[in-house]
Regions:
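Surface-exposed patches in mature extracellular/periplasmic domains of secreted proteins
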Residues: 37-38, 89-94, 104-107, 151-154, ...
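N-terminal Sec/ER secretory leader and immediately downstream segment
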Residues: 19-116
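Sec-dependent signal peptide recognition
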Residues: 2-7
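N-terminal signal peptide c-region/cleavage motif recognized by signal peptidases
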Residues: 13-17
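Membrane-interacting alpha-helical segments
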Residues: 58-75, 172-198, 240-244, 250
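A cross-kingdom marker for long, charged
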Residues: 187-191, 195-250
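Extended amphipathic alpha-helical interaction segments
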Residues: 112-206
Length: 250
């Protein structure tokens, strides 16, 4: 009985520390900033529909997508999933708080800024690299869930009009049929992202030295790195909630 009491006491004392680690990890890994960059892209997508839709339909689209991707709600869903999926956040937190981790996050945030996206709207420049650097990038391409996360972001932005129409005209997109179309789009986007993924990673992490890039790949391929990136992908999916009705989101 004493051992059980001690175990429960230890769990009570440890849980707030782990929760605090998760909050710190969420910020250190750049999640709030990336969500802000996503909202910038969402606003740009809304503007593209302004002149092609009737005013009432356009306003419904804006209202619906703003509700769906409300910042606090996206953060809440993503953080809850990260908390549920990542058993021990300490190793990932240590990495992202390190000088290299901060440099990785800075590179990723720079790549998703709206001015960078506008500059590269017609495609990224072809990056030349040594065979050794290409080898490390290949390892990173396998370790990072870039295809999957990129597909979710693309689907979320592209789906604002369809989601709004579905809310205005219930039953417009049948459940099973809609899910089948969504899965097909997801696979197609993952394939498209994968075709140029190595060059994309070379561009994003171009300011990392060869040694830093290798250290990053070592973390990403480690058990702790794999655990974090698997949890991160689940958190992206939970935060964006592609395929879920806006009315069903919490």
């Amino acid at each position: 009985m004493r051992r059980l009491f001690s175990l429960i006491l230890l769990m009570i004392c440890t849980m707030p520390v782990w929760a605090d680690n998760l909050d710190q990890l969420y910020k250190a890994a750049g999640w709030p900033d990336q969500r802000a960059h996503f909202n910038d892209a969402l606003t740009a997508a809304q503007e593209r529909y302004r002149n092609s839709l009737p005013p009432a339909v356009y306003q419904a689209l804006v209202n619906n997508s703003n509700q769906r991707f409300q910042a606090q709600a996206v953060d809440r869903r993503a953080q809850a999933q990260l908390r549920a999926t990542l058993a021990n956040p300490a190793p990932a937190l240590a990495f992202f708080q390190s000088p290299l981790g901060r440099k990785v996050v800075a590179a990723e945030l720079k790549a998703t800024r709206k001015d960078e996206l506008a500059k590269n709207a017609k495609g990224l420049p072809k990056i030349q690299a040594s065979d050794d650097r290409l080898l490390v990038i290949g390892h990173l391409a396998q370790a990072l869930p870039a295809r999957e996360a990129g597909a979710e972001v693309s689907l979320a932005i592209a789906g604002v009009a369809a989601d709004s129409l579905s809310s205005m005209i219930p039953g417009l997109f049948g459940g099973g049929q809609a899910q089948g179309l969504l899965d097909g789009q997801r696979q197609r986007l993952m394939g498209q992202i994968g075709e140029d993924l190595n060059n994309t990673l070379l561009y994003v992490y171009r300011d990392l030295s060869d040694a830093e890039l290798e250290e990053f790949a070592t973390f990403a391929e480690s058990p702790d790195g794999k655990a974090y990136y698997q949890a991160a992908l689940a958190a992206v999916r939970a935060g964006l909630a592609v395929g879920q009705s806006t009315n069903d989101l919490k």
